[in-house]
Amino acid sequence: MKMLTSAAAAFTGLAAAAATPPVAVEWKAPETMPAKVARPFYGYLPNGDFLVAGGSAFVDGRKTWTDGVYVRRDGRWSSAGSLAALARLDGVSDGLCCETPQGVFCAGGTDGGKDLSSAFLLSLSGASGSPGPVLSAQPLPVLPEPVKMGAAACDGKRVYVVASKNVYALALAEPGEGWSKVAELPGAPREQHVAAIQNGDQKERLLVVYGGYEVASKMPLYDGVAICLSDVGAGETRAVAPLPPLVTTIGAAFLPSGHQHVLLVGGFGWHGWIDRACKGMSETDPVRLGWQRKVWAYNAVTDAWCAYGELAAGDSPRCGAAAGLRPGKTPESYEILLAGGETAPMRRTDAVSVASFRKVAKFASSAWIVVGLYALLMAAMAVYFIRKKKDENDYFRGGNRIPWYVAGMSIFATMLSSITFIAIPTQAYLADWRYFVMAFFIVGMAPVAIYYYLPFFCRLGITSAYEYLERRFNLGVRLFGSAAFVVFMVCRVAVVTLLPAIALNAVTGVSIDACILVCGVLTMVYCSLGGLEAVIWSDFVQGIVLMGGAVAVLVILILKTGPDGAHVSTFWNVATAQGKTTMFDFRFLLSQPVFWVVAVQGLVSNLSSYTSDQCVIQRYIATPDENATKRSLWFNGGMSVLAQVVFYSIGTALYTHYRTNPAAMDVTMPKADSVLPLFMAVELPPWLAGLVIAAVFAATISTLSANLSSASTALVTDFLKRFRPSMSGRAQIRSGQACTYLVGVLGICAALALSRMESSALFDNFNKYIAMLTAGLTGLFFMGIFLPRVKGGAAILGLVANYAVCFGCEAAGCDVFGVRFHPFLLGGLGLVACIVVSLLASFVVREKGRDLSGLTLRTLAKGANSGRAKASGPAAST
């Protein structure tokens, strides 16, 4: 193994090296604010203004509590009134505050005589005619207990207050309901702790609380506590990684950054606090070893700390400063701000430090060359197939001459796509291997498709899978099924286009919108001109590139984990110790992704893909005969399971790499789905980064082209050709090209809309909606083959029941009659509802009998005609 890893390192040009942060903190020219205060209320307002209110100051050596309110807008500070006028507070400091979508939440603190329990929301009033910002204060319910030097955080809907021992929550939309107790911190009461809300391991939403000091002993605390805020497990607490050695949170700020990081800025050093608070030193004495200059970063997913820069040279470290982090679309548009605070005991400052992030690693020109060469290869293939003389049979059915291994690789590339390349590693990085159970059904469904479904598609001479539905049921069922498939394709095009756009944006900085447009338009042109044969052969090439790039990434990730000679052992030990290899969870729970829940999703989604998805069925009918199709299905099954192993391993390796090298991750990473693309951009050799990005786009193009080709075939065959039987072959091709552009444009628009939505895990949402949208189609084909008594009217009633159950339960938040279940069960519930309602309706709805010869399992001539029947769709026309 050691020789193997050494050879791999030599091949890739990699050696074990210290991780370099992909972005650096870059400080700008200092500013000054109108007052010298420490421990005020502070935060960014929704419009980007920074607010400072109240705080303590020293006047002639005497500590005072102030009520001034100041706002920074576009680098300039101005007065915005007083807390006395806004909130009837003559002076307050040591309060707790956080940013909310409505304004800055402020609560508690002290006025020098007593601890306070008041709470209010400071926001811009919208008044006009004033030269400066105009603020208003919205009163909120008083805290359950007086709190000073506590912490607060907001998840967008609720404000959480962490007092000395208890954690409380208030719903911003319904403040009249008051505060509710969420959890209790372990250990003795504490003060000067910090808190932030961030995305954690196992895709949980966490309230992370760190440090402070014991109220009684004044001894600093280094522990961390994570409180689960997710619907499942809400209020549960667990210990997380302690603070770095000799680092405290006393007087520090805790600022969420990106998708999963929190930055710790400012505060006392350990020796400074011990000298001042625990050894009885006078406040007039200087702090012996100074305060914290470093900026520390905590990753809530990998549960690891690292140093991530420090204050600018010549800038004094400070405690109790007003601090904020305003996110941006790029690292350079982020803003970190430290205003005021104390630089020594009894010494306040009006200094303001402002910083942003600077991207250190960039996509090299050599990487672009590799991507360009790959694009030229695809263009050459497109030109070749465009120049080939083709009729409608070539365009829609590939001329029935595609070799079985090419068709198998095409099915493999179509079913995996960029969703596999980006979303599955993200899933394994954020959670574990529980979703891998779905991969077993890729192979498990292959014999079902081969022995029970494939004969119908191969022997009926159909071009669209939904032609079978008209023969078996009626025209209405065919049209409904085809329309549902096209809608699903639009949704799939959106997700498949968005994922590589996220990748390219993370790697190059090109906007996500531009990436979506380029990828979508190029694929539309390629697919519309080349037809099915071009799509399948490009799938073959892209599938090879996809797997080659994936294996290279996995090898390099493991090489970058742990010391020389211990890469594999470190990878395995860290993964198992942190529970990242968990696959089988046999608890009987409906609300968690346990084995039974994931198995239902795997069964429904793969049964749908093999039996009712035109993308896959189109490849069945592109081979010369039924036996070739069978071989292609077995080939796809083996390749798919191998690919799942590789991509889940990549996700696990990403976790072990960033847990052992926390400084290597970008603290500004906006989405979890960017984790693999960012690794490619920062840590792969340029030529390999180009190859892997090409692989991502290979996956995208293969799936998009398959989606567009199959959707256009369905539209032409089931709608245009069905109602205009006399359409010429040339007219069918032109119509197919137009439909390709139509579906492509709709998918691109959906991708642009989806990119503006908050989504922590696209893979979960994709799996949920694929089951919801296709469960009814799966039920139709199942009933058509296995339940001969179900006819058209009953089948339509079953479809209505399927969508009512799926979308009704989803609208109810997967909580029906007090029973909460995981979204992965929606497809299974819909499928069962479709079959049961149709079967029951068949006893009530009277319908005229149809000739079912060759259309059900009972009437199919076993072993007869394993070749191809003449096409009845577009390809049949001359």
What is each of the regions a protein language model found here?
Residues F357-T878:
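Membrane-embedded helix-loop-helix hairpins and adjacent transmembrane boundary segments
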Residues T5, Y42, G75, H193, ...:
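Sequence-pattern detector for short linear motifs
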Residues A19-F363:
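Kelch-like beta-propeller repeat domains
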Residues A9-A19:
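Hydrophobic h-region of N-terminal signal peptides that target proteins for export
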Residues M1-A10:
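Sec-dependent signal peptide recognition
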